[in-house]
C-alpha cells in the first residue's frame, strides 16, 4: 500500500566525464521491478530441449526464438525487436536469496550486502548522480507491497500509489489557479500531509513548479490482449482460459505506471523513476507457473514496447529523442526454481536475470546458465564463459555497473563494492 | 518557543482531520499545553492507525481473501450462491451457511466440497487465489467463503480492526507494549470472533461454536488457550501469507529491526536439495539451520516456526491441531551464531522472547523517532534517553509523547523533570 518519493540529496554526486564505463550515458533512469519472481526461461534465457535436463520447461524450437544482435530470446520478447540494438541482457546473476522480502530490498538497492533497508535505493542514488540539484531525485510508481516498502534516505510514505498523488498535485496546479500562489502551495502541502506523507515543504514547492503547466495524461487504456494473442505472436500452449484470465485481469496497473513514468521523465519532474510490474501475486507463480509466466511476460514486454515507442517519439536534447537518454533496468528479486513443484508451479531460486536498455550499452546476451539453469562463471571482460579469471556474476556487480553507467561518483563509498561489468558497455 | 506547531503535531500523529484543540490559548506555547494536546490526540483511533503502520507494517500488508460468493436468482424460494459460474439446478445442494445457521441456502455442489480442506497433494490448505484448481470449495458451513463482497470486506476489516483496537487498548490503559506480544485476550468484534470460531470448529467439529453474534461490538475478551503471544497469533498475522517463513522474517525485521541478509544461497545447493522434492516449500526444513549459506536466516526462521507448529498458515483460513505441536524451540537474534534462549515452542514464549530482547526497545524507539522527527536525524542523546526510559517502562504513549516534546522543546525539557509521568 505504500509508495515513496525520495527527495533529499545526501551527499550529492557529481557526474564524472571520463573513466571506465560507456561512451554515452543515460541522463534519465527507470528501474522496473518485476515483483514476485520472473522465470527467465520465458524471456531472456530460453532453452531448447537438448540444452536442459528433462522435466525443465518451457523449451523452444529454433523457429520460435527471437534472434538478433547475438541474442537468443524467448518468443515473448518479439515486441522488443526494433530496439534490441539497445538491449544488454545478463543471465545467471547470483542474488543469493530465496526470500521475497530480502530479495526486494536487494533489488531496490541492487546489491546483496544490504546494511540497512532504510538506505537509499538505486533509483535515488542514480537520481542524485544524474541531477544532484533536483528536488525530487526518484519517484516510486505503483504499489509496492508494504513488505517491501521502498526506502530511500528520507522517505515519503503515502496511502496510495504516487501517481495518485501526482494526479492530485497536477489537478491543483492546473485546474485551480493560473499561477502558483501561496494558497495553492498550502493546499498541496495539505494534500501531502493528508496522505500521511512526511516531507518538508521545500521539495513540494519545487515539485509544483516543475509540474506547472504540465498536462496530466488520461487514464491508461491499453488493450494489449489483441496483440498478445494475435496469430503470429500467440504461443499455442497458451490456453483459452489463460487468455480469458488475461483479458479479465486487464493491464491497467502496469500501463498506468509506464504512462506516469513517461510523464515524469518527459517533463523533467524527476531524473529517476522506480516502478513495479504490478501485483506480486501475479508473478509469484508457485502454482501453474508456465501459463501465468507466459501471460505476464507477454504483457510486460508489450507494455515496455509501448514505453519505448513513446520515448522514441519524444524529443530529447541535442536533436536526439528520449530513447537516447533514458536508461532502463529490469529485474526481479528472486528467480524461479527450474523444476515444477507439485502444483505445476515453480518455487524460488537465488539467481536472476537483468535487462538493461539505453544509451552506451553493448547489445548482447551475457552470462550463461547450464542445463539446470545454474549460472556459469564468466570472463568479466567478455561476459561469456571462457578465460582464466572466470567468475560468477552477482547482484553486487549489477548495482555497481548501473552506477558506473550513469556516472555516479565513488559508488564504493555508498557500499557498492561489486565489479563493473565492462562487457555491457559499448 | 516550540519549534513545531500543534498543527504539525497533528500531521505527525495522523490526526490533522480532527477538530482543532480546545486549549486555553489558540497558540499553545508551554510544555504543559503541548502535553495536554498530545495526550488527547494519543487517544484517537487515527493516531493508533498511524502508529500501527509505523510499528507493525506487516499486519496491514495483505488482504485475507475469503472468497466472496455471488447470489444468483432465487431457486425454489431459496437463496442460491455460486463463486464463478452458475450451475444447473441438478447440481445444487443445500447448506446451512455460517452467517445464518438457522437457514439453508443452495450452492453448486462443486463449490461446496465440505471435505476438501487441502490441495490435491495435501501440501497446502485451500489458500491460494487459484485454489479452485486444487479442488477446494467453500467448505463445511461455507466457512471459507463470504456471502458477498460486502461481507468479505467486513471480514477483512475485522482482522485489521482486532490489531488496531488491541494496540489501542494497550495504549489507553498504559499497559506495557510487551503485553501486545504476550497477552491471550484481544479486542475484537463478532466478525473478529468468526475466525477463532472457525478454527475451533475445524478442531473439535462442534457446530455450536459457530453460533456467533456477528454484530457484537468490539470488546476485550479471551481466546482459546493456544492463542498466546498476543499479536503473534492473531488472524492478522497467522493469515498474512501462506508462505510462513515470510511472516517469521517480518517479525525479526519489524519487531527487532534486524533485517535478513542473504549470505549466499547457492543455486546448486538448492537444486540438490529440492530437485526431486516438489513439496519442499511447504515442509519443515530444520536441516537448513545448519546448512552453510542458509543457516544465518533459517536458524531464526525454522526455530521461530516451531512455535506455530500446531497451526497451518494461509490466506483464507488456518487450522490448529495440537498433535502437530512440538515441545521446545530456540530463539536466535542476529544470525545462527547468536542463540539467545531455549524454551517451550509456543507463541506465548516466542512473544515473551521478542519483547525481552534489547533490540525490541531500541527498535520501537527508533521507529517512533522516525515518525516524530519525520525522517530527520534524531539526536543521539535523546535516543539514548528514550531507549533507557522505554526499556524500563515499555509505555508506548509516553514514548511518543516524550519524543514529541523533545522535538518541540528540546531534550533538556525531559531531563529537567518534566517528562511524562
Segment roles from a protein language model:
Chain A
Residues 1-426:
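Ligand-binding pockets and gating/stacking loops
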Amino acid at each position: 500500500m505504500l509508495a515513496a518519493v525520495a527527495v533529499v540529496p545526501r551527499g550529492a554526486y557529481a557526474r564524472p566525464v571520463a573513466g571506465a564505463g560507456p561512451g554515452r550515458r543515460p541522463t534519465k533512469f527507470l528501474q522496473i521491478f518485476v515483483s514476485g519472481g520472473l522465470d527467465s526461461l520465458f524471456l531472456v534465457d530460453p532453452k531448447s530441449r537438448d540444452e536442459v535436463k528433462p522435466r525443465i520447461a518451457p523449451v523452444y524450437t529454433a523457429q520460435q526464438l527471437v534472434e538478433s544482435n547475438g541474442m537468443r530470446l524467448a518468443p515473448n520478447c518479439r515486441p522488443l525487436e526494433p530496439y534490441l540494438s539497445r538491449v544488454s541482457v545478463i543471465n545467471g546473476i547470483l542474488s543469493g536469496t530465496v526470500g521475497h522480502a530480502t530479495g526486494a530490498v536487494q533489488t531496490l538497492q541492487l546489491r546483496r550486502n544490504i546494511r540497512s533497508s532504510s538506505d537509499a535505493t538505486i533509483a535515488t542514488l542514480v537520481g542524485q548522480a544524474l541531477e544532484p540539484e533536483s528536488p525530487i531525485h526518484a519517484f516510486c510508481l505503483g504499489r509496492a507491497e508494504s513488505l517491501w516498502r521502498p526506502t530511500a534516505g528520507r522517505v515519503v510514505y503515502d496511502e496510495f500509489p504516487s501517481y495518485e498523488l501526482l494526479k492530485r498535485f497536477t489537478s491543483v496546479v492546473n485546474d485551480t489557479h493560473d499561477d502558483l500562489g501561496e494558497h495553492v502551495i498550502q493546499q498541496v502541502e495539505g494534500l501531502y500531509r493528508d496522505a500521511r506523507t512526511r516531507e518538508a515543504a521545500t521539495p513540494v514547492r519545487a515539485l509544483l513548479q516543475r509540474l506547472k503547466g504540465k498536462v496530466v495524461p488520461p487514464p491508461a487504456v491499453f488493450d494489449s490482449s489483441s496483440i498478445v494473442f494475435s496469430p503470429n505472436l500467440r504461443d499455442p500452449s497458451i490456453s483459452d482460459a489463460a487468455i480469458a484470465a488475461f483479458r479479465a485481469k486487464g493491464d491497467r496497473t502496469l500501463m498506468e505506471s509506464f504512462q506516469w513514468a513517461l510523464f515524469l521523465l518527459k517533463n523533467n519532474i524527476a531524473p529517476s523513476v522506480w516502478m513495479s510490474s504490478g501485483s506480486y501475486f501475479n508473478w509469484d507463480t508457485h502454482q501453474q507457473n508456465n501459463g501465468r509466466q507466459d501471460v505476464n511476460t507477454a504483457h510486460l514486454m508489450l507494455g515496455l514496447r509501448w514505453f519505448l515507442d513513446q520515448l522514441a517519439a519524444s524529443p530529447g536534447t541535442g536533436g536526439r529523442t528520449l530513447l537516447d537518454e533514458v536508461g532502463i533496468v529490469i529485474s526481479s528479486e528472486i528467480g524461479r526454481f527450474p523444476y515444477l513443484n507439485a502444483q505445476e508451479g515453480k518455487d524460488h531460486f537465488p539467481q536472476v536475470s537483468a535487462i538493461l536498455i539505453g544509451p552506451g550499452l553493448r547489445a548482447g546476451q551475457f552470462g550463461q546458465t547450464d542445463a539446470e539453469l545454474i549460472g556459469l562463471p564468466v570472463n568479466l571482460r567478455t561476459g561469456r564463459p571462457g578465460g582464466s579469471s572466470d567468475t560468477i556474476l552477482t547482484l553486487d556487480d549489477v548495482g555497481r555497473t548501473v552506477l558506473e553507467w550513469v556516472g555516479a561518483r565513488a559508488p564504493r563509498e555508498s557500499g557498492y563494492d561489486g565489479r563493473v561489468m565492462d562487457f555491457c558497455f559499448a | 518557543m516550540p519549534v513545531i506547531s500543534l498543527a504539525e503535531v497533528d500531521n505527525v500523529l495522523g490526526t490533522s482531520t480532527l477538530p482543532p484543540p480546545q486549549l486555553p490559548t489558540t497558540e499553545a506555547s508551554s510544555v504543559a499545553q503541548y502535553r495536554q494536546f498530545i495526550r488527547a490526540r494519543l487517544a484517537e483511533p487515527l493516531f493508533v492507525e498511524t502508529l500501527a503502520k509505523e510499528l507493525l507494517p506487516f499486519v496491514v500488508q495483505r488482504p485475507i481473501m475469503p472468497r466472496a460468493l455471488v447470489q444468483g436468482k432465487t431457486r425454489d424460494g431459496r437463496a442460491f450462491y455460486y463463486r464463478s459460474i452458475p450451475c444447473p439446478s441438478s447440481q445444487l445442494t443445500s447448506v446451512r451457511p455460517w452467517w445464518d445457521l438457522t437457514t439453508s441456502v443452495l450452492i453448486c455442489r462443486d463449490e461446496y466440497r465440505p471435505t476438501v480442506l487441502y490441495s490435491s497433494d495435501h501440501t497446502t490448505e485451500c489458500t491460494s487465489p487459484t485454489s479452485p484448481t486444487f479442488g477446494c470449495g467453500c467448505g463445511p458451513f461455507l466457512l471459507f467463503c463470504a456471502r458477498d463482497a460486502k461481507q468479505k470486506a467486513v471480514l477483512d476489516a475485522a482482522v485489521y480492526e482486532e490489531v488496531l483496537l488491541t494496540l489501542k487498548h494497550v495504549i489507553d490503559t498504559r499497559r506495557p507494549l510487551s503485553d501486545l506480544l504476550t497477552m491471550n485476550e484481544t479486542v475484537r468484534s463478532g466478525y473478529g470472533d468468526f475466525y477463532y470460531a472457525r478454527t475451533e470448529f475445524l478442531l473439535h467439529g462442534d457446530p455450536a461454536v459457530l453460533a456467533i453474534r456477528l454484530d457484537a461490538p468490539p470488546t476485550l475478551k479471551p481466546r482459546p488457550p493456544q492463542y498466546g503471544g498476543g499479536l503473534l497469533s492473531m488472524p492478522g498475522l497467522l493469515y498474512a501469507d501462506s508462505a510462513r517463513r515470510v511472516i517469521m522474517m517480518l517479525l525479526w525485521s519489524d519487531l527487532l529491526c534486524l533485517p535478513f541478509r542473504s549470505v549466499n544461497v547457492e543455486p546448486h545447493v538448492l537444486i540438490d536439495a529440492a530437485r526431486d522434492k516438489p513439496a519442499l516449500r511447504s515442509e519443515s526444513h530444520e536441516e537448513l539451520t545448519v546448512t552453510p549459506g542458509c543457516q544465518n536466516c533459517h536458524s531464526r526462521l525454522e526455530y521461530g516456526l516451531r512455535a506455530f507448529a500446531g497451526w497451518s498458515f494461509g490466506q483464507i483460513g488456518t487450522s490448529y491441531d495440537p498433535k502437530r505441536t512440538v515441545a521446545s524451540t530456540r530463539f536466535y537474534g542476529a544470525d545462527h551464531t547468536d542463540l539467545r534462549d531455549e524454551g517451550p515452542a509456543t507463541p506465548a514464549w516466542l512473544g515473551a522472547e521478542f519483547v525481552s530482547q534489547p533490540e525490541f526497545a531500541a527498535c520501537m524507539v527508533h521507529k517512533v523517532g522516525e515518525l516524530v522527527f519525520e525522517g530527520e536525524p534524531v539526536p543521539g542523546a535523546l535516543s539514548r534517553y528514550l531507549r533507557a526510559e522505554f526499556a524500563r517502562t515499555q509505555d508506548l504513549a509516553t514514548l511518543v509523547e516524550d519524543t514529541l516534546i523533545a522535538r518541540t522543546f528540546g531534550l533538556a525539557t525531559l531531563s529537567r523533570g518534566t517528562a511524562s509521568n
